Amino acid sequence: EVSWDEAISRASSELNNLKGEILFIASPFSTLEDNYALKKFAKIIFKSDNVFYVPYIDESFEDKLIKKSDKTPNSNGLKLLGINPISEKHIENLKEGKYKIIYLINDDINRIPEGNNFLKKVDINIHHLNIKNAYSDKVTVVFPESTYAEINGTFVNFQNRVQRIKPAVVTLEQERLIGEYSISRLDKFGAPNDSWSHGTRFNARPTWKVLTKIAKSLGYEFNFENSEEVFIELCNSIPGMNGWDYDTIGSMGKTV
């Protein structure tokens, strides 16, 4: 375990010394903001379109009421961003050792088919994770990623309705947007001996925030101060969403 600055420095160094191609793995479990930041990171800094995600489809799960075969919350968001499912071609490239770095956010690398056949051929792994998996101890750099209950952000449901999420759990570096997430009376007036006012605050960050730091260390300014600024920029890149902000989404969401 190291500090955030040390982890960011190590990731930046590995990316700066790149000898080969990078495969970026986006996440259907993450927000529009995090996935957009990853796509921008790949395109602006590395001139790469190698950004894909791993679907999670279970046809037996779907019913005629509310359950869908797609068991992820934001695959429609990835489609909106122009991020496609990983193809057989790219899995073959992995097995052939074409990609020397895998940069993955909020997913289990073992969900990529035939993982055992390519992981040993990848030199560097940089992952953003909020839960450990069977491979995470072997990863070069792991950034602790905030969960959906700790962040501001947006998802797109199966009806293409963009919906807000807001933090319900406090982290060490809690983002507070203007007019939102005020301190409750319980938190404000909790006495030192009140256990409910001293819950664990995890040292985690949203992916977009870490990518902004890494980009800066590599000489690029993303100029994102909060999640809404990421959202506004991504909306201006998508037909039909130009000019949207979090107020546009509101509490009921908005269909795109």
List where the protein language model places each region.
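A broadly structural signal marking compact, well-ordered functional cores
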Residues: 239-247
